[in-house]
């Protein structure tokens, strides 16, 4: 600062990206979420709900996958729009501390399957109100699945799988987000469970590991060569 002249603040990558940092540093619309900051531009990376409401999270252990899920959930809870979060966790209970208010937390796959079917019914009613030009509530529904057992249970249940397909597709316009965590870094082949095929088809994957180790999708060699720097915990492609 010199007299009335103020120098522009030099953008930087924070050591820890938090919802508070995002809210105080960047502007975002209600239909946008900041999922990180790009190293090359030091600019926020947005997801536009109208274009992409699903994020599949894969990669190595201890590289920040759980922290990202918590960050995303807290960003939603801190928004001005009412948010309801439904969590399916595994035996490690890594997401048990996300919050209590407006948060439903399950460890039992069978119980969560019933939740998925219930959510579809609620969204169907909301969708009908939208079609009849009523003003449905502008609340956000965030579904977080962080359990391979739950993925298997959903794939084995025709009702749950159809419900999830509708939630991911038909009811996308109703402020619905889905985070798929604990997704194995393994090739999704013809015989893989349907839910993994659905994830791959969205082409919206955050990979927390070096690209040379990526198996869940095929990475072109040119992109691998361009991104050879080893990543650190909290980094993702």
Predicted regions and their residues:
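P-loop NTPase catalytic phosphate-binding loop
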Residues: 23-203, 210
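Phosphate-binding and hydrolysis-coupling loops of NTP-dependent motor/remodeling domains
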Residues: 1-36, 44, 189-237
